[in-house]
């Protein structure tokens, strides 16, 4: 299946690709190309074995046809003729052949995505090997060096470092199209590819790795990529904790150590001293989660769910601590005198844990630190039994555990002091320090769970309309969780669709009613997401900060107010450019209001993974925030559809976290903030005008055109997406489950549907009209002014660069195929979309001075060009299947099977585009 043929032995049949010769990939001139060729060849072998040679020949014909269409040009006579032949062939095949075709291209993308992931890591390691680490862009070393270049040194640098706080919050999105089973299988394939990178590989080992790859690809061929049953909230919790086990727990101390080493080098210290002296870097990551706590529009999340979510998290984190202690117990094999405080501690441990004492005394006589770690591990085990038991804990768990994380921290501090006295500073500030950092970060709860609920639910509960009683029970659950796991386990309550100060006060009143004297410690977080709410958020927070009961509550909480800004719904309502400017102005309002009232503002950015929901390159987005909005702190959602991409691989996770650290530190320097203020002062009127016109153009199509909703329903697979069972949350907050009304439809499926149709409309529509109108009104000076702003203002550059990315990933020729499903009645709407696309591309190219989209990002540009023909194959199949299934009566016996194939194409297109919603 690969697009480039290797120079190697061939089969007599040209459809069967030969495997690359040689051993492994370590010495290949182009290891990525070699891996893609190998995976394509192995997949071809599996297709022949499992479906026959005719199936592979069909796949090859379709692949060559889509490539030919691209080569000729979709609008050319040759391209149209080629497409007609392809459509006729696809329309004639039976359902079994269609499934083989869909599976072949889908699995090809899953495999090549792994190869590209490996190449990212390979390239990063190469940069680290060939130059000073500070030369790597957006690393923590670059962050520290950048601060020095910007004049942030000495006490000012230390102050910024002490206040550094980054809080990624994991969410369970219904747009992670891949099953957990598939993700785990792909990790196995990745490890086998990694094995082939070993330069010491022998021919026998190479053959073994290839055999195992064939085996895994065969298993993937027979594994359904879509779920038969939608996952429940606790399934999503367990998936998140698998990421915790494999990546977050391991990578977190590595990040701290990387920053510690960078600070030491920057201060002129000897690099070898890192790990031998007390670290200055604190645990600045504050991991959060909405998984099991977000009940906005999700009736499957209840108070019981939230309780169970914390139990699952605690079980994972305490098992992780215990495993580390048992591992260190095996390595800290030091003979040392047992006297003083150490002897007293060992005697106390033995008296309280006599069974453990007998085993440790037998195994480790004269090795006090191994025995000490053995006791700590046993106490952690008992702590886990006590905290995670649904019923009464076992008798052994009642005594001997740690009552709080602080008690375990004190035990580790005591051990560190005793080991340091024995001359073991390297061990104290090495592996033991990593455990102390992990404990400081994760406590006994793992991820800090947050509750989110719609403001209308609170109003109804206050009025006595809480039919299940779950609203009040949620507050009781929060109080219980805090008693059991500590306040850090759950203390934030997010109010979606906040419209007034009363919405925040209502949460405190409900907590008082539910818990009585045991009111939980809560930080109330208003979420502003609609255009009206973003415009008035400053006034709402002003009223909130002057409301007597709430102000008293805020004083008790340390005069710190967190506010969340929603990127997804604001973009769906107003379009990408207008929403970006609304969010920027909202930040400015909130900064000013909180400054006036002497309250510390903490902003929480509810960014989606997709560009149409506020996603995009994160470093650029952080550097483009309003001046004063970062100040060493960042809190943002890590949406479900990108969690696996960012965190499944520890090396990529570490790189991502280094980039976040870099961006936060750079954005917090006075020089950067001054640059932002100067640029914003000159560009505010321009953005006011652009945003107004962009919003007007977007809303004229999406919200004011009476035929648009029907066109959207026909020209995208939105109705079919709603039945896929991707996540535990319904696609809409209210209304029809299978075909929700547009205003009730969540932003996620909204963007997902447009991504599947290849139009990507939410990320760019309206931008071209706004730019063109500005240039028309301001004539010769308009383009010059826009170019000046693009060069000088990170916010404006980020907004346009994001639009360019979305446009480059869109494909109007394929989108027109989807639009044809809407019939002639939808033609005017499609023509509006196509015209605006062409206008937006033209305006952005004029403004940036580029000849083609992404000319400044040639690697990504080439990747999209290479992938598009393969994605086209799946898109063509999806269009045909959608047409068939929609023409069928609901009771047709074939309808269910056709829908299953549609869902398979959705999964495949998402893999090919590396994007969902």
Region locations from a protein language model:
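Often metal-dependent polyanion-binding catalytic scaffolds in large enzymes
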Residues: 2-470, 522, 615, 702-705, ...
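Hydrophobic cores of alpha-helical transmembrane segments in multi-pass integral membrane proteins
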Residues: 44, 587-597, 838-844, 848
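Conserved alpha/beta core surface patches that mediate binding of polyanionic ligands
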Residues: 263-287, 504-509, 539-550, 616-628
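Catalytic or ion-translocation cores adjacent to nucleophile or general acid/base/metal-coordination motifs
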Residues: 301-332, 514-696
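Active-site cores of enzymes that catalyze phosphoryl transfer or operate on phosphate-rich substrates
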Residues: 371-375, 379-392, 423-424, 429-505, ...
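Flexible, glycine/charged-enriched surface loops at secondary-structure junctions
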Residues: 601, 671-682, 704-712, 849-857
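Active-site phosphate/pyrophosphate-binding segments
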Residues: 683-694, 698-732
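C-terminal accessory/interaction regions of large nucleic acid-associated machines
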Residues: 712-720, 725-917
């Amino acid at each position: 299946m690969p697009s480039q043929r290797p120079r190697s032995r061939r089969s007599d049949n040209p459809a069967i690709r030969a495997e690359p010769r040689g051993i492994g990939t370590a010495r290949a001139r182009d290891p990525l190309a070699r891996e893609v060729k190998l995976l394509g060849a192995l997949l071809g072998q599996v297709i022949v074995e499992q479906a026959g040679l005719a199936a592979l020949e069909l796949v090859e014909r379709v692949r060559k046809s889509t490539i030919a269409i691209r080569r000729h040009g979709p609008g050319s006579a040759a391209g149209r003729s080629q497409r007609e032949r392809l459509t006729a062939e696809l329309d004639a095949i039976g359902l079994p052949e269609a499934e083989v075709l869909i599976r072949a291209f889908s699995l090809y993308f899953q495999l090549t995505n792994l190869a590209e992931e490996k190449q990212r890591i390979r390239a990063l390691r190469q940069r680290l090997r060939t130059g000073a680490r500070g030369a790597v862009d957006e690393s923590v070393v670059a962050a520290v060096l950048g601060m020095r270049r910007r004049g942030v040194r000495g006490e000012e640098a230390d102050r910024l470092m002490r206040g550094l706080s980054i809080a990624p919050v994991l969410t369970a999105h219904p747009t992670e199209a891949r099953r957990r089973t598939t993700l785990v299988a792909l990790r196995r394939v990745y490890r086998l590819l990694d094995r082939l990178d070993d330069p010491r590989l022998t021919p026998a080992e190479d053959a073994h790795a290839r055999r195992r790859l064939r085996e895994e690809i065969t298993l993937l061929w027979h594994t359904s990529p879509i779920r038969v049953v939608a996952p429940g909230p606790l399934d999503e919790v367990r998936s998140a904790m698998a990421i915790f086990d494999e990546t977050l727990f391991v990578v977190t101390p590595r990040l701290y150590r990387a920053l510690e080493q960078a600070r030491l080098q920057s201060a002129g210290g000897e690099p070898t001293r890192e790990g031998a002296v007390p670290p200055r870097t604190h645990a600045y990551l504050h991991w959060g989660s909405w998984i099991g706590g977000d009940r906005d529009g999700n009736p499957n999340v209840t108070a019981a769910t939230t309780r169970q979510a914390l139990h699952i998290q605690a079980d994972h984190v305490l098992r992780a601590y215990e495993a580390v202690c048992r591992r260190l117990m095996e390595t800290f094999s030091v003979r040392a005198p047992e006297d003083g405080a150490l002897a007293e501690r060992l005697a106390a441990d033995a008296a309280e844990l006599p069974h453990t004492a007998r085993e440790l005394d037998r195994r480790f006589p004269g090795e006090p630190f191994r025995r000490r770690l053995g006791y700590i591990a046993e106490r952690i085990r008992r702590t886990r039994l006590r905290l995670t038991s649904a019923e009464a804990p076992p008798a052994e768990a009642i005594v001997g555990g740690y009552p709080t994380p602080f008690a375990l921290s004190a035990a580790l501090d005591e051990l560190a002091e005793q080991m340091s006295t024995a001359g073991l500073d390297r061990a104290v500030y090495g592996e033991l320090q990593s455990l102390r950092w992990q404990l400081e970060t994760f406590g006994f709860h793992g991820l800090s769970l947050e509750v989110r609920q719609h403001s209308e639910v609170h109003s109804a509960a206050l009025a006595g309309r809480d039919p299940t009683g779950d609203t009040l029970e949620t507050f009781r659950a929060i109080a219980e969780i805090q008693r059991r796991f500590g306040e850090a386990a759950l203390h934030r309550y997010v109010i979606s669709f906040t419209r007034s100060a009363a919405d925040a006060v209502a949460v405190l009143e409900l907590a008082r009613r539910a818990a009585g004297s045991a009111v939980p410690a809560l930080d109330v977080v208003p979420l502003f997401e609609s255009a009206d709410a973003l415009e008035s958020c400053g006034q709402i927070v002003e009223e909130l900060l002057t409301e007597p009961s709430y102000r008293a509550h805020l004083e008790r909480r340390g005069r710190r107010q967190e506010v969340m800004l929603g990127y997804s719904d604001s973009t769906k309502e107003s379009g990408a450019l207008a929403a970006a400017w609304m969010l920027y102005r909202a930040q400015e309002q909130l900064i000013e209001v909180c400054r006036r009232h002497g309250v510390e503002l903490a902003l929480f950015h509810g960014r989606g993974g997709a560009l149409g929901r506020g996603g995009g390159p994160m470093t650029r987005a952080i550097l483009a925030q309003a001046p004063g909005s970062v100040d060493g702190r960042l809190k943002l959602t890590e949406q479900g559809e990108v969690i696996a991409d960012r965190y499944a691989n520890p090396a990529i996770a570490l790189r991502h976290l280094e980039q976040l650290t870099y961006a936060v530190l750079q954005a917090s320097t006075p020089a950067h903030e001054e640059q932002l203020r100067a640029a914003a002062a000159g560009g505010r009127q321009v953005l006011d005008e652009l945003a107004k016109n962009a919003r007007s153009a977007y809303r004229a199509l999406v919200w004011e055109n009476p035929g648009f909703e029907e066109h959207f329903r026909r020209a995208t697979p939105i109705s079919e997406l709603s039945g896929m069972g991707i996540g535990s949350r319904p696609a809409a907050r209210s209304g029809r489950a299978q075909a929700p009304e547009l205003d009730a439809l969540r932003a996620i499926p909204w963007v997902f549907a447009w991504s599947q149709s290849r139009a990507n409309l939410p990320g760019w529509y309206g931008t071209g009209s706004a730019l063109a109108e500005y240039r028309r009104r301001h004539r010769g000076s308009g383009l010059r002014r826009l170019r000046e702003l693009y060069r000088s203002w990170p916010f404006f550059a980020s907004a346009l660069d994001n639009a360019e990315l979305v446009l480059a990933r869109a494909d109007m020729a394929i989108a027109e195929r989807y639009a044809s499903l809407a019939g002639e009645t939808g033609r005017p709407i499609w023509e509006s979309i196509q015209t605006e696309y062409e206008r937006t591309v033209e305006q952005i190219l004029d403004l940036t001075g580029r000849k083609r989209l992404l000319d400044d990002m040639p690697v990504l540009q080439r990747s999209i060009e290479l992938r598009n023909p393969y994605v086209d194959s799946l898109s063509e199949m999806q269009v045909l299947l959608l047409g068939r299934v929609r023409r069928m009566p609901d009771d047709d016996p074939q309808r269910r099977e056709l829908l299953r194939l549609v869902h398979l194409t959705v999964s495949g297109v998402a893999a090919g585009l590396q994007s969902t919603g």
